[in-house]
Each structure stands twice: as C-alpha cells, then as structure tokens.
C-alpha cells in the first residue's frame, strides 16, 4: 500500500492568503498536488517567488508538485464606476463605451473591451457574474453599444461581463496572454490553462504558440463558455485537442444556466477518461470555507460526487487564494477524498482503442484487470513519456499507481493524474523485483497491517523508448 494513496488529486490556487514560503510549504504538506498561479493578478516578480517556494516545498516533501499557469483570457470587465455604485432597474438603458475612461455618474459606462466589434443586436450581456442581465439593442458607434436592463441590481467597478452568444472568432488569446505565455515558456510550467475557449481551434492555436516557444507545457482547456458546450461533438473535439479539461463551473453557470452544469461535468469527466485526458472539477467546491472553518454538507457532497464520477482532480480557488482557512480547506478536501474513495468505486469506462494511443490503452486495460483480479496492492509503471501511466490512470483502478520515469518533466506532469505517484530514477534492464524492492525501501510502498509482502503488477517495456511498453509482470516482494 502506498503512502501517497490519495487517488483524486488536489489543485490549489495560490494567492494573498498563502503568499509566504511557510504557507506554500503547509499547502504541500497538507496534500496539494498542483499549485495554480492565476495570471489575472500579480507581477512576474511575485510569480518567480511563488515558483521557487513551490519547488522547495516539493523537494522537502520528496514528491512531485506540478505548477499550473492559468491565463486570464478575454475576461471582459467594466472600468471604474463613480463611487463604486450605480443602481439599475428593469427597462433602464446603458451605453458601454470602450472610448470612455471615466464614469461621470450617468448611464455611459466605461468598459475594458471594444464590445462594438464583436456583439450584435439581440445578443445577451450579463454583468457582475450574471447578477444583472441585459440585451443589446443598438450598436451606437464603432466603440459603443446600448443595452436594455432586465432586472434591478447594483453595478460596481471592474465587474466582469459575460457574452454567452457572442462569437470571438478565434480571438481568445489577448496581448496580455501572449506576454504571459512567453514568460511561462521560460519558467517551465507543467500546465497552461486556457480561458474562455470556444472550440478546438482555440486549443490548436495555443499549441502552435507553445511549440514555437519551445514549451512542453500541457494544455488544460477551461470549459466555461456556452459555445464550448453547444453539442457533445464540440465538447469531445475540445477534449481530444487538449491534454486536459477544467470544468470551470462559475462562468459556465452564468452563460449556460445552473441546471446545465452537473450534466456537462459528468459528460466531460467521461470524455476525458475515454480519451485518456486529465479532468479537473473547479469552482466553489468548498466555497463557504472562505469565511468558515468547515464546509457545508452540500459542498462535501459536491466534492464526493466529483470523486465518485472519476475526476482526476478537484480544485480550490478563493478558498486557498483569499480565504481565512486555506490550509484547513485542503485538509478537509483530502479527508472527503479519502473517505469517499474508500467507500465507493468509480464505474468502469471503455477507453478509445482505435486512436494513436490504442497500444497504451490496451496494455493499461489488461494491467488493471489483472491487478484487480489478483487483489494486487499496487501497479508499478515504467514510462518514458507518461502515456502508459495516463492510460492506466484513465482506467480508474482501485489501487495506487507508481509511475517510474527518468524524466523530471514527466514526473511533474503526472502529479495531477488519478492515483499516480511519480518516482524519478534512471531506467535499467533489471526491472521487476529490484524495482519494487527499491520502492519499498524509499517508502513509496508499504505492506498492509499483518502482512509482510507486497503484491505488485509491473508494466514496462524497452528502456527510454517511447511507445515501447509491452510487458506485464506479477511480483510478490
């Protein structure tokens, strides 16, 4: 049995609440597997500090902790509102003008994006996370639109806008994003999360940029727009284009409706497992812990449901970035994960065995089936690229996976995958008993109480050859 036996992983957002080396270390010790750096806020100098702290904490704990760069994307916000307060009621008309820099108290509001270039008459526009709903009634000028308000509310400075029916025409990577991507390429982030994507083409564009910069970061596509979930086929195309998916439920609920979120979440988790892609469930999972030391019962059920559905990871946002109880939130999430995984089993799913990863998937299926039939304690996987480990993970085995690799980058990028614990070491021809013994000595594998042996299924192949996985062994040590 592995000491790292938390199958569903925890992704935590770094922010002011944990902006010290000591707090980052506490996050990692509490059970965080990946740290999210939100590039909507903060300076590059702050990012460099955080990266150094995360790597130091991971080294101290003796395990891989991944780092995710979350791009802001075309997040559209209002400008500064006079007195930070403007009341509206049904029937009111507002003019949102990109050319306006200062609000004078009238219905002419500054906005940080030229909506006139993208929006059409009749399209909805939601203000302040959907709290105020309106519809475009006129394109007033080359920089301004007029909207009619549908409900009462208060408009405040720099609140976000959602445009659920507006086509951005592939223009989802902003100038700020480009600068951040270039910065990230020099910092070797493990993952880059892409915001507000609308199609698989958006993912491919980011892929081309990363390749041109020499970055090997994996792409996490954030599913949060109405257009991204228009059809099952569109969702599947995005899943196939990306390396992973983040179910970003906040903006998705605003754009598509609250009732849509649970079904889309379930579909995306299934699609990711089918295609061997990472799936992260995010947004307000333990939201009440921003202000309270314990979660609500509904939040506990929310986290447990994501675990039961087979998500690779669950994410904490404001809970760790700005909350009063960041470390407690991680501990609570870990406790929920452990209890749920020990009292439930993720339903099996058929992986795609016709695509380019069919060999990996077939070997993975055989290894997991064998491990469960003989009640193995652990699956040990030697992997050069990480592909075999990901395929085994997608099968959602009810036991830990120790992924042995000589590639530090691969070890780090596997940190978020379901049930995976990375063990970095050079490959050798002499695998099997010696490898399992080494894992026991290093503390990665422990015997069960009352037993003196470990039963392991070992998946391996030709050393340092990508695509060479072809051998399954059973070893009792």
Name each model-derived stretch.
Residues 1-477:
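Non-catalytic helical/linker scaffolds that mediate oligomerization, partner binding
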């Amino acid at each position: 049995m592995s000491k790292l036996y938390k199958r569903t992983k925890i992704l935590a957002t770094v922010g002011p609440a944990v902006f010290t080396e000591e707090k980052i270390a506490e996050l990692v010790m509490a059970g965080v597997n990946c740290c999210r750096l939100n590039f909507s806020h903060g300076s590059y100098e702050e990012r460099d500090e955080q990266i150094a702290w995360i790597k130091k904490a991971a080294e101290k704990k003796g395990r891989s902790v991944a780092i995710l760069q979350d791009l802001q994307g075309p997040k559209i916000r209002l400008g500064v509102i006079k007195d930070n307060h403007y009341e509206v009621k049904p029937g009111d008309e507002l003019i949102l003008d990109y050319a306006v820099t200062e609000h004078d108290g009238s219905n002419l509001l500054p906005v940080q994006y030229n909506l006139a270039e993208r929006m059409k008459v009749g399209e909805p526009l939601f203000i302040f996370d959907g709290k105020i709903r309106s519809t475009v009634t006129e394109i007033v000028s080359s920089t301004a639109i007029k909207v009619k308000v549908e409900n009462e509310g208060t408009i405040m400075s720099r609140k976000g806008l959602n445009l659920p029916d507006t086509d951005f025409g592939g223009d989802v990577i902003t100038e700020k994003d480009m600068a951040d991507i270039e910065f990230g390429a020099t910092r070797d982030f493990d993952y880059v999360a892409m915001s507000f994507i609308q199609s698989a083409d958006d993912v491919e564009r980011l892929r081309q940029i990363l390749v041109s910069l020499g970055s090997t970061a994996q792409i996490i596509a954030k599913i949060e727009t109405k257009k991204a979930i228009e059809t099952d086929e569109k969702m599947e195309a995005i899943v196939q284009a990306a390396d992973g998916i983040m179910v970003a439920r906040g903006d998705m609920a605003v754009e598509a409706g609250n009732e849509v979120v649970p079904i889309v979440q379930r579909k995306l988790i299934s699609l990711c497992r089918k295609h061997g892609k990472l799936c992260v469930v995010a947004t307000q999972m333990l939201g009440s812990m921003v202000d309270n030391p314990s979660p609500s019962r509904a939040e506990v059920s929310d986290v447990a449901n994501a675990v039961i559905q087979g998500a690779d990871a669950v994410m904490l946002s404001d809970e760790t970035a700005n909350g009063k109880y960041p470390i407690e939130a991680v501990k609570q999430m870990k406790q929920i994960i452990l209890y749920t995984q020990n009292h439930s089993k993720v339903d099996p799913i058929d992986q795609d065995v016709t695509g380019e990863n069919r060999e990996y998937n077939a070997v993975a299926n055989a290894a997991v089936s064998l491990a469960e039939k003989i009640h193995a304690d652990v699956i040990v996987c030697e992997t050069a690229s990480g592909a075999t480990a990901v395929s085994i993970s997608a099968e959602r085995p009810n036991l830990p996976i120790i992924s042995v690799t000589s590639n530090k980058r691969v070890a780090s990028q596997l940190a978020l995958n379901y049930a995976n614990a990375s063990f970095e070491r050079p490959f050798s021809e002499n695998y099997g008993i010696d490898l399992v013994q080494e894992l026991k000595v290093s503390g990665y594998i422990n015997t069960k109480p009352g037993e003196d042996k470990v039963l392991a299924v070992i998946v391996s192949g030709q050393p340092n050859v990508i695509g060479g996985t072809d051998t399954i062994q059973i070893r009792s040590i």
